[in-house]
């Protein structure tokens, strides 16, 4: 039986091998040309005051400002999913370095704190709403939602009740995506054609069902760059949670997205 000293020694060796391997992979990826495509970033809440609930999903305003400024300094230009779909059809050109900012759930701070930050930088974003949460407690009101859309914010669906579509039968899932779309359009929110899968979970059957329900695109929780060859119903997305290590963590998540793309991990190519 191994004694504790040998266990520690072997554990140290194993850790060292893992570090060297990861370093070699990162070094190799960085030595190669950056892959084609662009990232889609997944946010939830931007709020100055730390919320009691969903704190892990809140990006404080100061951190978010740093992230936006970093993106602009690196030459990124925000686009909407609509812009991407139009460019895919040859109806418009994309900027040299596009990025899409998305926000799930539709918190009210998207209007009070996020919108001014975006408008000050002439940036776009897409917000995915849970239909039955609109107007409730800490979520956007109908009036705010319509105003944001008039001011250039793209609105999409996050289903009617934010339940994982993979946990229900296809008929129930169909009602979830159909009801959310109809509810917003009935309340004078312009045509809804994009969806964010709750918890990022999907199946081939769900993907096909969205197309049948006249959605044009959907985002997952799988990181990676998006190109015109990416399945529009399985767009790659990089999660940006509450930062523990400030801007350095944000840069790492962007780098990880690049590496995932170069290694071909969970890339949804048509």
Predicted regions and their residues:
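Cell-envelope/glycan interface and biosynthesis
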Residues: 28-29, 111-112, 124, 129-130, ...
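Residue-level marker for buried hydrophobic side chains located in beta-strands
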Residues: 101-102, 155
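Short histidine/acidic/glycine/proline-rich micro-motifs that form metal-
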Residues: 131-135, 164, 198-201
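Charged helix-capping and loop-helix junction motifs
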Residues: 138-145, 172-176
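C-terminal active-site subregion of NodB/CE4 polysaccharide deacetylases
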Residues: 2-10, 18-101, 107-109, 167-270
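Short beta-strand and adjacent tight-turn residues that come in two discontinuous sequence segments
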Residues: 128, 158, 218-220
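Acidic (Asp/Glu)-rich catalytic clusters
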Residues: 115-123, 140-157
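Histidine-centered catalytic micro-motifs
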Residues: 42, 154-162
């Amino acid at each position: 039986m191994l004694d504790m000293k040998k266990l520690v020694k072997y554990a140290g060796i194993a850790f060292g091998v893992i570090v060297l391997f990861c370093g070699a992979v990162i070094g190799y990826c960085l030595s190669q040309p950056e892959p084609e495509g662009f990232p889609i970033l997944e946010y939830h809440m931007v709020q100055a005051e730390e919320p009691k609930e969903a704190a892990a999903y809140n990006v404080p305003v100061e951190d978010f400002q740093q992230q936006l400024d970093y993106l602009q300094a690196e030459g990124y230009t925000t686009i909407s999913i609509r812009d991407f779909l139009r460019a895919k059809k040859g109806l418009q050109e994309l900027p040299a370095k596009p990025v899409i900012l998305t926000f799930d759930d539709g918190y009210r701070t998207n209007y009070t704190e996020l919108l001014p930050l975006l408008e000050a930088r002439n940036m776009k974003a897409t917000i995915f709403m849970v239909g039955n949460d609109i107007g409730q407690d800490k979520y956007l009101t109908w009036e705010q939602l319509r105003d944001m859309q008039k001011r250039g914010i793209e609105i999409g669906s996050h289903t009617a009740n934010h339940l994982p579509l993979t946990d229900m039968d296809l008929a129930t899932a169909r009602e979830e995506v159909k009801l959310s779309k109809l509810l917003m359009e009935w309340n004078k929110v312009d045509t809804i054609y994009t969806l964010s899968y709750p918890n990022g979970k999907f199946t081939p059957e769900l993907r096909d069902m969205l197309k049948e329900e006249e959605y044009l695109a959907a985002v997952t929780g799988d990181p990676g760059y998006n190109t015109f060859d990416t399945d529009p119903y399985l767009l790659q997305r990089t999660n940006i949670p509450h930062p523990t290590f400030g801007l350095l963590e944000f840069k790492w998540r962007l780098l990880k997205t690049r590496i995932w793309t170069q290694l071909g991990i969970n890339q949804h190519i048509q």
